[in-house]
């Protein structure tokens, strides 16, 4: 009997062991991978329009690179992310469903949130008005470790904490007027809405920067007129 015949005979004898072994391994892989957390990544681009700044006396009124740095730093700042945390919390409390996934939050994550939510905070939720709920939570928030809205941001909670939100990538796309935002989390709705909320905060911040620059330009021309 040559080696080929020997191997063929050997594998034929253990064919059932191989079959059941393969099925067992497949079943174990399927079973254990169901407990692995899914992750969802969302990319978003924000148009800044910074390079359209006005030149005065040969020098730019708005330093382009500095302005982009300011916008990015604002987006990464703790103050901005705290606002995102409150608005995200309000959004999920208003739209969450205990038994049905939706575009805002998965049911399991809503249940986890409600389980740790104090009754006094739940009483602040107005399901008919997101803006009112945001205002209520903002007014309730105090810099105190016993304050739920404050602590959920400053402790390692998923989705709403500084650690979670600080993982958002904010960068300028090359030399373009686009700012790219990239975020990954375990909930598709939360991932997408987190970026939407942050984009809104960045747009507000940029409008303030532009308003400040416009005031500087007006002051410059007024000064020139007085000379």
PLM feature spans:
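Hydrophobic and amphipathic membrane-targeting/association helices
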Residues: 1-227
């Amino acid at each position: 009997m040559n080696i080929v015949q020997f191997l063929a005979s050997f594998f034929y004898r253990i064919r059932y062991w191989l079959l059941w072994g393969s099925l067992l391994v497949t079943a174990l892989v399927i079973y254990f991978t169901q407990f692995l957390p899914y992750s969802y990544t969302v990319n978003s681009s924000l148009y800044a329009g910074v390079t359209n700044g006005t030149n005065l006396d040969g020098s730019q009124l708005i330093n382009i690179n500095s302005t982009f740095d300011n916008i990015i730093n604002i987006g990464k700042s703790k103050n901005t992310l705290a606002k995102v945390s409150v608005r995200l919390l309000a959004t999920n409390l208003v739209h969450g469903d205990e038994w049905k996934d939706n575009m805002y939050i998965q049911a399991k994550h809503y249940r986890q949130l409600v389980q740790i939510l104090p009754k006094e905070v739940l009483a602040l939720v107005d399901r008919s008005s997101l803006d009112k709920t945001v205002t209520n939570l903002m007014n309730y928030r105090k810099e105190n470790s016993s304050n739920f809205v404050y602590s959920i941001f400053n402790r390692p909670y998923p989705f709403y904490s500084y650690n979670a939100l600080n993982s958002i990538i904010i960068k300028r796309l090359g030399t373009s007027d686009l700012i790219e935002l990239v975020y990954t989390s375990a909930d598709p709705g939360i991932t997408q809405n987190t970026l939407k909320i942050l984009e809104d905060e960045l747009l507000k911040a940029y409008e303030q920067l532009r308003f400040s620059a416009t005031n500087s330009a007006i002051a410059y021309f007024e000064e020139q007129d007085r000379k």
